[in-house]
Amino acid sequence: MKENVASATVFTLLLFLNTCLLNGQLPPGKPEIFKCRSPNKETFTCWWRPGTDGGLPTNYSLTYHREGETLMHECPDYITGGPNSCHFGKQYTSMWRTYIMMVNATNQMGSSFSDELYVDVTYIVQPDPPLELAVEVKQPEDRKPYLWIKWSPPTLIDLKTGWFTLLYEIRLKPEKAAEWEIHFAGQQTEFKILSLHPGQKYLVQVRCKPDHGYWSAWSPATFIQIPSDFTMNDTTVWISVAVLSAVICLIIVWAVALKGYSMVTCIFPPVPGPKIKGFDAHLLEKGKSEELLSALGCQDFPPTSDYEDLLVEYLEVDDSEDQHLMSVHSKEHPSQGMKPTYLDPDTDSGRGSCDSPSLLSEKCEEPQANPSTFYDPEVIEKPENPETTHTWDPQCISMEGKIPYFHAGGSKCSTWPLPQPSQHNPRSSYHNITDVCELAVGPAGAPATLLNEAGKDALKSSQTIKSREEGKATQQREVESFHSETDQDTPWLLPQEKTPFGSAKPLDYVEIHKVNKDGALSLLPKQRENSGKPKKPGTPENNKEYAKVSGVMDNNILVLVPDPHAKNVACFEESAKEAPPSLEQNQAEKALANFTATSSKCRLQLGGLDYLDPACFTHSFH
């Protein structure tokens, strides 16, 4: 029994469902909220699209709640916004609040709900289109003709309080055209359009938009007919010409400023100044300084050469006593029938350079041409009258005119040049002491004694201290005795003059034995040959004062100082005298004669020390 009741119930339900499906009755479809709009931020309206009704009458309702609330509210006004809409008045609208809303559809078969929508009134503002749009063509006398457009803002928006800010946009087109010409007007409610085609009919519309929101709908179109006599002056050409002219002017000004020329200089060029004769501007541009300087008369750069061959290597400084001796010698020879020839003084070295080729040639050639005539190494004396020849005093020349000897007494044979007031004092320069000594020792070949670098074993040179009267007789006997033993190759002896340091004592001869590698000289006293009898050491004639080589200065100048060990040197001299003369001794005596004769002339007194001028050695050895 129970089984029969259950099966009957199932059958009834299946029959009911079949009947409903055959009649088309279903639950409603899902609705959709598609738009919410606020015209003035005070009220807003939302619209939705309903779904299928299922063949049955369907009711729609909108429910919402504000963010942060749980209480649900239903739409306050379904009529103001039209069908399927909900309008929120001022009392239901709140700024800066978010609304969460949805739509519910219900019929006999069931119900359905839309998706939730979040709405902020600030961002859903869309004003109404502008009102009272007016269009007019104006042709002022002093201006170009134009199309004047004017409109009014929507009435629902309060612009006076500043609650709203609207932006406007205008569009127009000829009636038969397809595209619109859009112009942005900003916040103003008037606008002028200049580019129009005469004789055509235009459509004009306007719309507005708040600062935060959407553009409104376009206002209704307004038509305007442009007259046929409406002449539009096209200013595009004139604007292009003006812009091009401005660019050209800027280029010209830039070029003038870049080159540094002024407008005044271009209009009124300056008067050219006088040109320097011989000055060529092209030489300056090409950079040839040598030709430019020669054109201006300036000296060019000095030529490069070996300055070691041109410059004087050493200098000799004469003090005032030398000038006094020169004046004395010139007074002693007032009229000898001889005219001295002076060399041009060298302003750089202080005395005429001994390296002058002309001076050396004159020194070497003149003694060979006339052996009986004495020529000074620095001054060449020539007779004014060729028939009248100058001869030296008989006391000064001996040994048949081969070896002239000059003593300090009596008539002096001066070799000093006469002073010239308009020139510098003629001076001689030092030569390298090594070259001088090689010239002296090379041909002689005499045995030498080596000097060490420290100067400890410096050899001595002797000086015989005699009176002026005894010196004359002794020198005469020495010349006569020396003439008997020497051959034709005996070199000349230079005159024994008064030394610059004022010593009236004649000096004895010294002998050059050897030259060290450092340029040091080995000196020995010369053997007396005037008599074969040795003299006692106690006699006045044998009282000799020796000098030793103290050292060589930076300028290769020998420094001679008096030797306190006179006894040792005297013994050395006596042993030298006892040695028999030989060929080597004879050759050494030749070199000694040249060295001794020039030593008295070439010495200078400086601070109590005696100097030897090697320049004089060269002249005597030649």
UniProtKB/Swiss-Prot annotation:
CDD domains: FN3. Residues 27-128, 129-229 form the Fibronectin type-III domain. Expressed in breast, placenta, kidney, liver and pancreas. Disulfide bonds join 36-46, 75-86. A motif (Box 1 motif) lies at residues 267-275. SUPFAM superfamilies: Fibronectin type III. GO terms for cellular component: cell surface; endosome lumen; external side of plasma membrane; extracellular region; plasma membrane; receptor complex. It is a single-pass type I membrane protein. Glycans are attached at residues 59, 104, 233. The keyword rRNA-binding does not apply. GO terms for biological process: activation of Janus kinase activity; activation of transmembrane receptor protein tyrosine kinase activity; cell surface receptor signaling pathway via JAK-STAT; cellular response to granulocyte macrophage colony-stimulating factor stimulus; cytokine-mediated signaling pathway; embryo implantation; lactation; mammary gland alveolus development. Residues 326-378, 461-505, 520-545 are annotated as: Disordered. It is found in: Membrane. The chain crosses the membrane at residues 235-258. It comes from the Eukaryota. A motif (WSXWS motif) lies at residues 215-219. Residues 1-24 form the signal peptide. Homodimer upon hormone binding. Interacts with SMARCA1. Interacts with GH1. Interacts with CSH. Interacts with NEK3 and VAV2 and this interaction is prolactin-dependent. It is linked to Multiple fibroadenomas of the breast: A benign breast disease marked by lobuloalveolar growth with abnormally high proliferation of the epithelium, and characterized by the presence of more than 3 fibroadenomas in one breast. Fibroadenomas are adenomas containing fibrous tissue. Hyperprolactinemia: A disorder characterized by increased levels of prolactin in the blood not associated with gestation or the puerperium. HPRL may result in infertility, hypogonadism, and galactorrhea. Belongs to the type I cytokine receptor family. Type 1 subfamily. The WSXWS motif appears to be necessary for proper protein folding and thereby efficient intracellular transport and cell-surface receptor binding. This is a receptor for the anterior pituitary hormone prolactin (PRL). Acts as a prosurvival factor for spermatozoa by inhibiting sperm capacitation through suppression of SRC kinase activation and stimulation of AKT. Isoform 4 is unable to transduce prolactin signaling. Isoform 6 is unable to transduce prolactin signaling. This is Prolactin receptor. It comes from Homo sapiens.
